[in-house]
Amino acid sequence: ERGELALKDARSKLADVEDALQKAKQDMARLLREYQELMNTKLALDVEIATYRKLLEGEECRLSGEGVGPVNISVVTNTVSSGYGGGSGFGGGLGGGLGGGLGGGLGGGLGGGLGSGLGGGGSSSFYSSSSGGVGLGGGLSVGGSGFSASSGRSLGFGSGGGSSSSVKFVSTTSSSRKSFKS
């Protein structure tokens, strides 16, 4: 009887520990998603700040008679990894470029991204995924004033049933502005 009671008690404790582990995994996945949302927001704000900073520098140059030079913005690498059983990772970003001035204007931009995830599990389980996207935008204006803007977005997602997964996101966006005197 003692052995049966000890066995029953051990099974009960094991079930409690498994429940706690499952809850911890869910909490970790939720926290990872929230963290990634915050990082995506921060990344978008950083790109926007850099864009406006470059635009202001170009306006200062134009007002002082130096003309507007090329504007190159944001090469961003964002890697997120998680290392628990049934792990998942998520990566995304936004890149944008903006250029403007007086006179004829020519502008174009390219944004692209590639995400891939790789995770290894137990004795013979293995999981791999990759995803990529590319966005292209450009504008041309000639006349009294010129303005061009471009942005690219890409999103990669991977998850693995093994012990870890990772997503790496790379976004490159550039925009240029050239003035022509008539």
From Swiss-Prot:
Q: Where is this region: Disordered?
A: 157-182
Annotated site location: Stutter: E1
Per UniProt, what is one Pfam family of this protein?
A: Filament
Positions with biased composition (Low complexity): 164-182
For the region Coil 2, give the residue spans: 1-63
Q: Which cellular component terms (GO) are annotated to the entry?
A: intermediate filament
What keywords is this UniProt entry annotated with?
Coiled coil, Intermediate filament, Keratin
Which segments carry the region annotation Tail? 63-182
Q: Does the keyword Coiled coil apply?
A: yes
**Residue limits of the IF rod domain?**
1-63
Self-association and partners: Heterotetramer of two type I and two type II keratins.
**Family assignment?**
Belongs to the intermediate filament family.
Any extra remark in the record? There are two types of cytoskeletal and microfibrillar keratin: I (acidic; 40-55 kDa) and II (neutral to basic; 56-70 kDa).
PANTHER family assigned to the protein according to its UniProt record, in alphabetical order: GATA-TYPE DOMAIN-CONTAINING PROTEIN (PTHR45616), KERATIN, TYPE II CYTOSKELETAL 5 (PTHR45616:SF32)
Protein's name in the database? Keratin, type II cytoskeletal 60 kDa, component III
Which organism encodes this protein? Bos taurus
Q: What is the lineage of its organism?
A: Eukaryota, Metazoa, Chordata, Craniata, Vertebrata
